[in-house]
Structure formats: structure tokens, C-alpha cells
Amino acid sequence: MDNAPPEVRNHVFIVEDSAPIRERLGALLRDIEGVSIVGEAGSVRAAVEGILRTRPESVVLDIQLLDGSGVDVLREVCPKAPEVVFVVLTNHAHPQYRRICMEAGASHFFDKSTEIGKVREVITGLGATRH
């Protein structure tokens, strides 16, 4: 029997201004085999610096942040790290926000109040495609 830890196939960075929600997302994602949380941030500045430093495969991103918007993160990071998959998870799931986020480089856009389970599905799927 092989007792080696599972291979990490998806390094994830979480960007969320609410610490309790960040913790909940971390717990939800850490439970997925092959996923490793490589960083967390609650502000635009910390998110941009952390994402560019850790180069995760995917980022779970809120729109409302302590010092600005998740759209600012998308506009700053996507040109520098186009390989990163951004999954926007927000309470502001209006069509105009969806359009703006997708145009700025997001790959997925979900409503935090009704679609949090879809984040798990996407992150699981990303890990499954990387082996």
C-alpha cells in the first residue's frame, strides 16, 4: 500500500475580504484531493502580490475587497499571468459584473449565495485535467 501524499495538481489562491468566508472556502477546497491552498488575501494589493509570487493554477476571487475591486485584480494579473484560471465568487452576481469580469479575464463567475458548490466542481475539474 502506498502511503505517499496525493500529488498536488492544482495550487489555489483565495481572494476574499471576509475572513470567515475565506476560512470556509479554504476548508471546502482543501478537502479536494490534489488541491493545495498557496495563499490568501483580502485586498487588491495583497492579492496581486500574492498571485504573482505564488503563480497558482487557479484563483477564487471576490469582487468586493478591502481596498478596491476584484476587477482590479483581474486587470492587473491576467496580462502578466494569462495561464491562471480565475473563478469569481460574489454576492454581486449582476449581469454587468459578469460581463466586466469575463472581459477582464475571469474564466468562471458564480453567485456566492447560491452557487458556492460550483466553485468546488470547477476546482476539482481543473485538478483532474492536470496529471
Predicted regions and their residues:
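Short amphipathic alpha-helix used as the core "switch/output" element in two-component signaling
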Residues: 71-81
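Non-catalytic signal-transmission and effector/linker regions of two-component phosphorelay proteins
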Residues: 1-11, 117-131
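The feature encodes the CheY-like receiver
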Residues: 66, 94
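Acidic catalytic/metal-coordinating carboxylates
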Residues: 43-46, 69-72
